[in-house]
Amino acid sequence: MTSTGKDGGGAQHAQYVGPYRLEKTLGKGQTGLVKLGIHCVTCQKVAIKIVNREKLSESVLMKVEREIAILKLIEHPHVLKLHDVYENKKYLYLVLEHVSGGELFDYLVKKGRLTPKEARKFFRQIISALDFCHSHSICHRDLKPENLLLDERNNIRIADFGMASLQVGDSLLETSCGSPHYACPEVIRGEKYDGRKADVWSCGVILFALLVGALPFDDDNLRQLLEKVKRGVFHMPHFIPPDCQSLLRGMIEVDAARRLTLEHIQKHIWYIGGKNEPEPEQPIPRKVQIRSLPSLEDIDPDVLDSMHSLGCFRDRNKLLQDLLSEEENQEKMIYFLLLDRKERYPSHEDEDLPPRNEIDPPRKRVDSPMLNRHGKRRPERKSMEVLSVTDGGSPVPARRAIEMAQHGQRSRSISGASSGLSTSPLSSPRVTPHPSPRGSPLPTPKGTPVHTPKESPAGTPNPTPPSSPSVGGVPWRTRLNSIKNSFLGSPRFHRRKLQVPTPEEMSNLTPESSPELGHLQLFGNPVSKVRSVAMELVILVQTLAYTSFRLLGTFLPVRYLRHSVLSRPPERARLVLRGAPCTHMGPVWNMVGMAYTQNPPIMGETGVYGSQWVMSSAPSKHYTSLGLSVPSPSCSLSPSLFPFCAPDTTNCMEVMTGRLSKCGTPLSNFFDVIKQLFSDEKNGQAAQAPSTPAKRSAHGPLGDSAAAGPGGDTEYPMGKDMAKMGPPAARREQP
């Protein structure tokens, strides 16, 4: 743990773990404190579990490493997620998902007891997550309301896998662990036991506590409590539904052989009752191809270390022998599950860390050079300085080069789960296996090669960084996925709600606010079902507020379009527009963002602002964050950065309009209006000097009063007419 700040009296010290600033203490676990962490750029909240290496024994530290490896195996909506792992000589930091609802224990104490309907909701989510764990041979062994957290929507998150164990095949567990009130009789007797059966008993005790508000076995004397658990005799209140009583008796059964399994529980009449109640969210099945490993060189060292941390593969030679075997086995299944996790969520070095001086700062566990899915070793990742000079990557802004020289190269160790958090891709390109073709809004450093297109719509040079040669021949779908992944990072970020700006925020939409560009993340993961088209426009105006109202005036007359004004931070203006639902694609969202593309203008001069909108259509739960500002030093129309769009802006607009007009959709009118706005803007810029403000659009009802209009906090009325859209036209693929 590190601290920065002045040493004078009354100075505030800020403690950081990587990009996260440590705040208040959330709780205290068995191995250390849990503190709230806030990302210094994105303001994402996380829970950071701090483990003191010096105060814990080697066996306890091995349990922590086992917890890390187990959390990599589990990806379920009702299991707390692991983002990253940091460490230094004294501490180990686990960056976990933050949930704001607190413990189920506190919720139960507050409400006394729950209704059968609410108890069934929680119970279903617990069983769903536990069934997923058991299918991956993981037993929790410490289930209790204190380890069940609630998110902002009162959904369950199973936490604290410090006691969890991997139970392979028909083997039995020996370690007696857990809480006496929730432990099964065979664990208390010190016998070998089935971890899956022990978890079922604990779930039965939890369900009883939810319905009754008290525990089935309780006593102030620990010896008496253990005797009650061994006998398994408890009082069943009359207000518990009869069907639920039979379920409880089947789960809280002393004889482990007669105890219900998770399969029987999920088929029980009380569990499947309540037809109008929503089913627990099911995770996307992970199908991993198990292939043969020809030699030891083909085994990933990070995955091998993670498997060794699980505890059940302590014989390293036997583990290697099983992995190299031609037959499919449990060891190979776990190996390829961990390898799949590492492939999908690679852990990279941090960028854009706050400037600070520490003797022993926490360092992120990053991936070592590893093998890809085809058995070929990937080249070692290089630092940003090397990429900018040798491999033709995006040039590093001067600000980033200075910061990286101050911080130095981050150390590399065992792989940890990656949160994928990044700052704005405009200000600091992210190191990824596939270089991202993104530019920088900041001035290009001296000595960095640039090229100028032969023709520029505005007649001015348009210096851009040279494109990376490594992505030239890759199909556009692969490049699109690479761009989306570098934009969004790991899907494991905590989703943030969009805030409607206050009048003060909208009144401060001026270039003097800040030249820094923030990163906007709207929704969840990018999925293949999302269909989107993107456009960008660079406008010469004096204030950003004028640009906002001008575009807003363009959107107002479009039918079937609902919109609201967003802003974060104040120097960026955004609009979210919701169109009519499509028959096959679902609701249509349009994101419009505006930000500086050059330095803030001096009073009396014009400023250059970039505007991009993205129309995406998908089921509501699949919406992705595609509303990112596009940098462009040019004062003219610029080609879209998305590779599936036409290289020419006007042609791209024609492609989008034609594609949508085939559906007969009301949104085709929207693109017609925008296309006309583009045409007027292009003609206006061609007739004027680059320093002259562009003509105001005549399409919007705001007219010349747009710049002096009301505060941007006004939420305009949403359209009442919601028309059905026809089937979408096929996407036009371009190489």
UniProtKB/Swiss-Prot annotation:
Activity regulation statement: Activated by phosphorylation on Thr-175 by STK11/LKB1.
Annotated Basic and acidic residues bias: 346-367
Record field: catalytic activity: L-seryl-[protein] + ATP = O-phospho-L-seryl-[protein] + ADP + H(+); L-threonyl-[protein] + ATP = O-phospho-L-threonyl-[protein] + ADP + H(+); L-seryl-[tau protein] + ATP = O-phospho-L-seryl-[tau protein] + ADP + H(+); L-threonyl-[tau protein] + ATP = O-phospho-L-threonyl-[tau protein] + ADP + H(+)
PTM entry text: May be phosphorylated at Thr-261 by PKA. Phosphorylated at Thr-175 by STK11/LKB1 in complex with STE20-related adapter-alpha (STRADA) pseudo kinase and CAB39. Not phosphorylated at Thr-175 by CaMKK2. In contrast, it is phosphorylated and activated by CaMKK1. May be inactivated via dephosphorylation of Thr-175 by PP2C. Polyubiquitinated by the APC complex in conjunction with FZR1, leading to its proteasomal degradation. Targeted for proteasomal degradation by interaction with COPS5. BRSK2 levels change during the cell cycle. BRSK2 levels are low at the G1/S boundary and gradually increase as cells progress into G2 phase. BRSK2 levels decrease rapidly at the end of mitosis.
CDD domains to which the protein is assigned, alphabetical: STKc_BRSK1_2, UBA_BRSK
UniProt record, GO biological process: actin cytoskeleton organization; axonogenesis; cell division; DNA damage response; ERAD pathway; establishment of cell polarity; exocytosis; G2/M transition of mitotic cell cycle
Annotated localization: Cytoplasm, Cytoskeleton, Microtubule organizing center, Centrosome; Cytoplasm, Perinuclear region; Endoplasmic reticulum
EC numbers for this chain: 2.7.11.1, 2.7.11.26
InterPro entries xrefs: BRSK1_2-like_UBA, Kinase-like_dom_sf, Prot_kinase_dom, Protein_kinase_ATP_BS, Ser/Thr_kinase_AS
Modification sites for Phosphoserine: 295, 368, 383, 394, 413, 424, 428, 456, 513-514
PROSITE patterns: PROTEIN_KINASE_ATP (PS00107), PROTEIN_KINASE_DOM (PS50011), PROTEIN_KINASE_ST (PS00108)
Biased composition (Low complexity): 411-429
One term of GO molecular function: ATP binding
Top-level EC class as recorded in UniProt: transferase
Keyword entries, A-Z: Apoptosis, ATP-binding, Cell cycle, Cell division, Cytoplasm, Cytoskeleton, Endoplasmic reticulum, Exocytosis, Kinase, Magnesium, Metal-binding, Mitosis, Neurogenesis, Nucleotide-binding, Phosphoprotein, Serine/threonine-protein kinase, Transferase, Ubl conjugation
Region (Disordered), start-end ranges: 346-476, 493-514, 682-735
Active site: 142 (proton acceptor)
Modified residues (Phosphothreonine): 175, 261, 460, 464, 510
Named cofactor requirement(s): Mg(2+)
Residues in UBA domain copies: 298-340
Pfam family, one: KA1_BRSK
UniProt binding sites for ATP: 26-34, 49
Subunit note: Interacts with FZR1, a regulatory subunit of the APC ubiquitin ligase complex. Interacts with COPS5. Interacts with PAK1.
Purpose: Serine/threonine-protein kinase that plays a key role in polarization of neurons and axonogenesis, cell cycle progress and insulin secretion. Phosphorylates CDK16, CDC25C, MAPT/TAU, PAK1 and WEE1. Following phosphorylation and activation by STK11/LKB1, acts as a key regulator of polarization of cortical neurons, probably by mediating phosphorylation of microtubule-associated proteins such as MAPT/TAU at 'Thr-523' and 'Ser-573'.
Protein's name according to its UniProt entry: Serine/threonine-protein kinase BRSK2
Organism: Rattus norvegicus
Lineage: Eukaryota, Metazoa, Chordata, Craniata, Vertebrata
